Amino acid sequence: MKSLALLLSLLINFSIGSYINFIPYDNSDCTGAINGGGWSILEYACFSIDVRYNYQFTTHTLNGEGFVQWTQFPRVVGKTQCFYQDLPISNASIGSCYKNNPLSTFDIFRSLPSNQYYLISVTSEPFYPTNQAGMIVLQYMGNGECSNDNVEIMQYFTNNTQSEDGITGIQMKWYCNDENEPYETQCFNGKNCFDMPQQYKCSPTHPFFNTSDEISGGTGAGDYSGTGSGSSSGNSGTSDGGSSGSGSGSGSGAFISIIDQNDKNNNKNNNKNKNNNNNNNNYNQYEKSTGDGGITKPHDNYISSFCT
């Protein structure tokens, strides 16, 4: 499939890992130009973008066919936890063209149209289209570090992508103007529209580092760090899992809360005394189902942050 050939166009080296990709198209064949809002999500990462639900993705093989599955977890206030509790599981075959629906709306503040489709793929590197002008890319990094080795989630919009705030109903269009400056058009009930400059970048090859303190989310030890939806910047998390950033414009802040499910040696050392200090309990443990029905050992988790 021609669309899959685009996966070979990555120009940046990333750390090795499995990323589940939701590559957007405007037709049920997932052919032609990539168009809409897409995702590239690290396998096993427990995350919440809008602080309403938590999600976790895994890959599996059944009868020789590969597929991805994900679970939507109810979110406890102040906690990002993904425990298996007999919850409904969504799935899609790798290489299939998957129709957008409420269970694939991972950011309610930027809900995408129901007529959008996703090409489902799995790669060892995070994917986003590098051959399109006017890309707006949001990156979420692991372990509080903004570097190539910590990319956990990528959320991107092609030029003129339309979305809607699922809470307020405000319609939004993301675009880059003739001067290659990022903007968001907001409309109320299809009228009273106005343009808002954004502090993201318009670039087909987005840099994976924090470009400005003014537009970065906090990297504190709190439960989550915030990012501005408009011109406002997010506040740093606090040691007791305190505040998050909220954006201007639509009034709905863009949040991020990720817990990495990888087994990190430095986290093991840092968390040796967690049982003796409940106030610093910024991690939980999980049990990951293996492909053959077994259970792997628990892994340490750690808080991630947003970078632009």
Swiss-Prot record:
Q: Where is this region: Disordered?
A: 213-308
Write down the species.
Answer: Dictyostelium discoideum
Primary localization class, coarse: secreted
> What would be one Gene Ontology cellular-component term for the protein?
extracellular region
Please give the start and end residues of each transmembrane region: none
Protein name (Swiss-Prot/TrEMBL): Uncharacterized protein DDB_G0290387
Top-level taxon: Eukaryota
Q: What residue spans carry the Gly residues bias annotation?
A: 217-231, 239-252
Q: Which InterPro entries match?
A: CfaA/B/C
Q: Kindly state which keywords UniProt assigns to this record, in alphabetical order.
A: Glycoprotein, Secreted, Signal
Q: Where in the cell is it found?
A: Secreted
**Disulfide partners:** none
Q: Which Pfam families match?
A: CfaA_B_C
For bias type Low complexity, the affected ranges are: 267-284
Does the keyword Signal feature in the UniProt annotation? yes
Residues modified by carbohydrate are N13, N91, N159, N210
Residues annotated as signal peptide: 1-17
